[in-house]
Amino acid sequence: MLAKGHRQAAEDIEKTVIPLQSTPYAARVVIEGAWGAAFHWIAYGCATKHQKHQDSHSRLGRFLRHLGEGTVARWWEDLDLVRQGGWYGNNTDPTAAQHALEVLEHIHTWALS
């Protein structure tokens, strides 16, 4: 996928999950959506800033550190932990969903900067 496609995917996912943030039973979907949108924003940001990106979330933190994007790597790894707790575990409260959206906002801002 090209940078433009990653940006469109991120924007589409954000438009879908942000309205759900106030729906308590939607926390799992909000967290997963924030994670997915963040992945696409990272791909977009890497493509536009470094002329390369990774099409897999596997070892994405390592890839980002190699590019000198340590802060983004930490945001990604934080969000990945929230996702694991939200999707596979019991951490599905609105606070976790809100945290996921806050991390997404940081990544979104970085990608467009």
Short names for language-model regions:
Residues 1-113:
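Terminal alpha-helical segments
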